[in-house]
Swiss-Prot record:
PANTHER family attached to this UniProt entry: AGAP000124-PA, INOSITOL POLYPHOSPHATE 4-PHOSPHATASE TYPE II
CDD domains reported in the protein's UniProt record: C2A_Copine
A GO molecular-function descriptor: inositol-1,3,4-trisphosphate 4-phosphatase activity
Keyword Lyase: no
Protein's UniProt name: Inositol polyphosphate 4-phosphatase type II
Role summary: Catalyzes the hydrolysis of the 4-position phosphate of phosphatidylinositol 3,4-bisphosphate, inositol 1,3,4-trisphosphate and inositol 3,4-trisphosphate. Plays a role in the late stages of macropinocytosis by dephosphorylating phosphatidylinositol 3,4-bisphosphate in membrane ruffles. The lipid phosphatase activity is critical for tumor suppressor function. Antagonizes the PI3K-AKT/PKB signaling pathway by dephosphorylating phosphoinositides and thereby modulating cell cycle progression and cell survival.
EC number of the protein: 3.1.3.66
Amino acid sequence: MEIKEEGASEEGQHFLPTAQANDPGDCQFTSIQKTPNEPQLEFILACKDLVAPVRDRKLNTLVQISVIHPVEQSLTRYSSTEIVEGTRDPLFLTGVTFPSEYPIYEETKIKLTVYDVKDKSHDTVRTSVLPEHKDPPPEVGRSFLGYASFKVGELLKSKEQLLVLSLRTSDGGKVVGTIEVSVVKMGEIEDGEADHITTDVQGQKCALVCECTAPESVSGKDNLPFLNSVLKNPVCKLYRFPTSDNKWMRIREQMSESILSFHIPKELISLHIKEDLCRNQEIKELGELSPHWDNLRKNVLTHCDQMVNMYQDILTELSKETGSSFKSSSSKGEKTLEFVPINLHLQRMQVHSPHLKDALYDVITVGAPAAHFQGFKNGGLRKLLHRFETERRNTGYQFIYYSPENTAKAKEVLSNINQLQPLIATHADLLLNSASQHSPDSLKNSLKMLSEKTELFVHAFKDQLVRSALLALYTARPGGILKKPPSPKSSTEESSPQDQPPVMRGQDSIPHHSDYDEEEWDRVWANVGKSLNCIIAMVDKLIERDGGSEGSGGNNDGEKEPSLTDAIPSHPREDWYEQLYPLILTLKDCMGEVVNRAKQSLTFVLLQELAYSLPQCLMLTLRRDIVFSQALAGLVCGFIIKLQTSLYDPGFLQQLHTVGLIVQYEGLLSTYSDEIGMLEDMAVGISDLKKVAFKIIEAKSNDVLPVITGRREHYVVEVKLPARMFESLPLQIKEGQLLHVYPVLFNVGINEQQTLAERFGDVSLQESINQENFELLQEYYKIFMEKMPPDYISHFQEQNDLKALLENLLQNIQSKKRKNVEIMWLAATICRKLNGIRFTCCKSAKDRTSMSVTLEQCSILRDEHQLHKDFFIRALDCMRREGCRIENVLKNIKCRKYAFNMLQLMAFPKYYRPPEGTYGKADT
């Protein structure tokens, strides 16, 4: 017997009027007792002794489930089972589930209508509300067999929560069979005898036993309110599939939107505006420049101000979005939604097996991070950035070329300056406060903190880039002579001794000026260290004279420069504050001089990047910001969900703070036409996630939405946890240790465009991406094996042969095989075994993504949970016809059809083809 399903379910919660769900009159109805955050009601169906309308006809049966609300008395089509072919005793694998927020009561009536499907390719169920007892008009491809109805309270109060109802014709007269309705409670032990149901499966009898063992908690249910603050609008589906030993396993499939789809882009855009306003102000404060450079500065500021205004407008528009928490695929080209990820959802499968632990499997599905509004006529970021840097390197005399590494370094030093200067000032004031209190211990502690921060400050200026930037800025002042465009030294030059003879300087590209004193910066910079040494020496002297038995941590410095301590005159002990105050003032003055010079010179470096090819470089920055915003929203969503589900797993938490997390992206984009540009955008966006770190903090209020800090080169995402959850974390994480992620992307095009690329085009982009990211994955595995404790590694290796999987993955990447989906299966398996975060992406995360995640789910059921081999294809069809992914299609394009045609599907790998009747023409 072959099972196929009709693409006909509708999630009723999307179609009931809002007022109905919150009707004041609802209080007179009896609510269903339920577990918080669990579905209110789940049941499964089976029919027996169905009467065919035509003698000897083999029935192809489905059941349509409708809901009659006790107030409205209107019928809402809610969902459907799959189609079971060739039997009068169909047993349906697709169940019915009502999520926790659905307005259902004991008085709610459920209507079950049984159809005989004659033409699956035309069979659909349209959403509509009909008066009670009115049958829908005849639909193409099906014929009505019979119906039955019951109240929810009758089912819940029945013996063993099982109803056997007679199916009657539309006039209520003739009985055409029976239908069994059985309540499902996932994870509970079923009392009494197991329910034996026999069904004909491809010519053999298969006894399916419905029994479950006591489960272990999949994830702490205490965590669910926290997760629900991030996830919204869940769509739930229920299935039962037989195992290889003919027992039932139960599967709950869930798909949820995330409010982070809009929250993260708004956070990020706000940071961009703040960063760009600060940069613009620093450019304005560069001081007097020669006419050439001043004109460049004015031009840069004009364009930068326009860019800031654009970001502010986008932020204003995003703040108006208060409805849906996801961006549909049909909106991917909208300018105001550019920063928002496309169709971001959590795809979750919860499995309850007879003999295995309950398990959760999560995949984040999202459209490939790409700048759709900008278009792909000239390619994506990977190509555009390479071309831009090549052209900038060969620019004319009017600009100074700084490599991307040096530009990033300038931004890093500027950021460090802005962070460290106020910190040092604070610690200096604390030192004075300790002196006024005459507390030796407090004085030593304050000095230790001041020394550490000041040493970091001094170290920030050791880079040769600062020296060359100072000289470049000097030549740009009025009267400066620009004999040759200055450029920073390479890393090898930076590491060379700085005491080379001056004659060697003529060989580099740094300009010279007869009045420029190259040693002046060294003196200014060194004065900070000397000022600190004076403070250390004074503290040592004060504590020593006070009779302290221990010196401060700066004794070594005092020994190196004994003249400092010798030069300090003796003072009475009550004058500690007065003796330290002028030294602190000197330190602050020296720092101010260093900061002023360094900020101006490094800002001049940033001016060079902006001055070249305006507005192209700003448009590239915009494109990169857009792509990164989409990628980051998905990453933060995935990280929070992974943290919630693994919060009480000590091994995972140790891996989190010791190694970091692997984040694996599965790409399904072709290397043909516009999708090449999408893949180029996606590759850069995912690579940019390396500059993101996470920090877990305790939530001080009910607001647990993440907060982002930092700048374009380095972001920290602060994830807030309720106190009870926060206390369960290891000390290292609670103390604020930064948690790192290792993003990797593996792409295999599977559609008909990839066929064209493989035969007539170029697949080198895909090959390069896969090879590069394999090396990153291998590096992560190496770090994982080195840093995790030996006892953990020993147990881990017993359970997983990752080395063999990695070797197999490398062989497949190097094999040059067309549409080698084995690459994706292996990468996904490795990611799961390494406790990683899984993503699946295609252009809009709707069609190809749906085929991939459903295949992955069924493969997991087969490989990890003993799904009966004869039911693999049927399970796959169930999930594709009546599962969450067909609901995703409906949410995106208001049509229950995957956007494939027969010609396209001929090019798809076998297991990536949807079942008949679920695909066709759809406007996307």
